[in-house]
Every structure is written in C-alpha cells, then in structure tokens.
C-alpha cells in the first residue's frame, strides 16, 4: 500500500494513560440526506506514540498503519497544537 493513500485524521488526545498508546477523538460532519442539516459524528482511535510525547488535550495528526495490537491501527505523525495547561 502506498503511503500517500493511507487515511490521515486530525483529532484531540483524550487519554494518554497507556504506555506508548494514545486515544484520539476524531470529529467529522456529515450532511443529512433528507433535511441537509450537518450532524457531528465522533469516533475514538487508538494510536501508537513511540516516545510518549502527546498529552491530553493536544491536537494531533494520525496515520493508518498495519495492525500493531488488537485495537491499534494508527500511529502518531505529528503534534499540530499542544494543549494549554492552566
């Protein structure tokens, strides 16, 4: 599979409690067929984070990869925006 044809998503890290694994919440919008209203859909993906760099609240980009475990099918590409800790 060519690297350019892999799925790439951008989302927010909602959990980093696992070792080398983050949970990313990806929100998308779909248009209702009948009424045309935009409806928000969200899905959680587990992604591989080798250096444990991503923290909760960060906006990250993940890319599809080979299965790394039972649930992990994505890997961390980059941290787009770091969370502001107050």
UniProtKB/Swiss-Prot annotation:
Keywords, comma-separated and alphabetical: Ribonucleoprotein, Ribosomal protein, RNA-binding, rRNA-binding
Entry similarity comment: Belongs to the universal ribosomal protein uS17 family.
Gene Ontology annotations of biological process type: translation
InterPro entries: NA-bd_OB-fold, Ribosomal_uS17, Ribosomal_uS17_bact/chlr, Ribosomal_uS17_CS
Function: One of the primary rRNA binding proteins, it binds specifically to the 5'-end of 16S ribosomal RNA.
GO MF, one annotated term: rRNA binding
Classification via Gene3D superfamilies: Nucleic acid-binding proteins
Pfam families: Ribosomal_S17
Species classification: Bacteria, Bacillati, Bacillota, Bacilli, Bacillales
Provenance organism: Shouchella clausii (strain KSM-K16)
GO CC terms: cytosolic small ribosomal subunit
UniProt name for this protein: Small ribosomal subunit protein uS17
Subunit structure: Part of the 30S ribosomal subunit.
